[in-house]
Amino acid sequence: MNDLIDDFLHFLIVEKGLSANTIKAYERDLHYFVSYMDTSRTLTDPDTLERNDIVGFMAFARKEGKSPRSVARYIASLRSFFHYLMHDGKMSHDPMIQIETPKQAQSLPKVLNLDDVEKLLSSSDTSTPLGLRDQAMLEILYATGLRVTELVKLKMDDLHLQMGFIQTIGKGDKERIIPLGKTATTVLEQYLEEARPKLRRPKYRNDFVFLNHHGQGLTRQGFWKILKGIAKESGIEKPITPHTLRHSFATHLLENGADLRSVQELLGHADISTTQIYTHVTKLRLKDVYKQFHPRA
């Protein structure tokens, strides 16, 4: 079974061109299923899988405390895997028939108000190279709506500061050109001039924009650790995740009159329905404003 999973992952890399993070997610999901089957019964041939095996796996995942979102992702990964095996002639039937994806409550993105954004963006210690780097990263995230993966993968050739934009390769290897505001440009230029040269190390010749204290490119996990520290320092009580500034970027644009198609393009969403969730956020925030300030609310 593990060999078949390896073949599938290779197919996703070579034929589908999926990102490393997506490949890892598929790998984790499928090996989680295999580990369950190892405790359930001996599985040597995927063609012996039945609907009851999938139902049992879903029950097992729920019992382990997996969220409906996680279970839905497992089911999606298995569907893709079995479809590949059937197309490749390694399975003759689909055990996923009549398996329904668990319904998920749609959670709205967590968004910071403008005061909290200011607190967060001013909480880095800019007297140090690492502090300047951190402020520049946060300013760019809020100014552009980049995903964290896109941020840490930025290279020097992606910056076009004199022209006022940056370019990035997003999901599906799609290139985006994103304007960069004056504040973010100023902070980024200061980081590049004063801090980045101090973080570079001769042994690591890379052109990543944002470097760690070893002179290597930052990872998503490294950024997450940095963000947690800054969020704590800011005193903001709301939970803040790496996606919070992206959500805030989109919501604040819509609140100030940006059209949905433009926000979709800036975020790099393939489907506008993904962007539409932010319109629900702005409606809820308008209701809060109404309740707070209208005399008869």
From Swiss-Prot:
Localization per Swiss-Prot or TrEMBL: Cytoplasm
Keyword Cell cycle included in the entry's annotation: yes
Record: active site: R147, K171, H243, R246, H269, Y278
CDD domains xrefs: INT_XerDC_C
Sample GO molecular function, one term: tyrosine-based site-specific recombinase activity
Any coiled-coil regions, as ranges: none
PROSITE patterns: CB (PS51900), TYR_RECOMBINASE (PS51898)
Keywords: Cell cycle, Cell division, Chromosome partition, Cytoplasm, DNA integration, DNA recombination, DNA-binding
Main subcellular location of this protein, as a coarse class: cytoplasm
Database matches in InterPro entries: CB (IPR044068), DNA_brk_join_enz (IPR011010), Integrase-like_cat_sf (IPR013762), Integrase_catalytic (IPR002104), Integrase_recombinase_N (IPR010998), Integrase_SAM-like_N (IPR004107), Recomb_XerD (IPR011932), Tyrosine_recombinase_XerC/XerD (IPR023009)
Tyr recombinase domain segment(s): 107-291
GO cellular component: cytoplasm
GO BP term, example: chromosome segregation
Core-binding (CB) domain mapped to chain residues: 1-86
Highest taxon of the lineage: Bacteria
Subunit and interaction comment: Forms a cyclic heterotetrameric complex composed of two molecules of XerC and two molecules of XerD.
Family designation: Belongs to the 'phage' integrase family. XerD subfamily.
Role description: Site-specific tyrosine recombinase, which acts by catalyzing the cutting and rejoining of the recombining DNA molecules. The XerC-XerD complex is essential to convert dimers of the bacterial chromosome into monomers to permit their segregation at cell division. It also contributes to the segregational stability of plasmids.
UniProt-recorded name of the protein: Tyrosine recombinase XerD
Source organism per UniProt: Listeria innocua serovar 6a (strain ATCC BAA-680 / CLIP 11262)
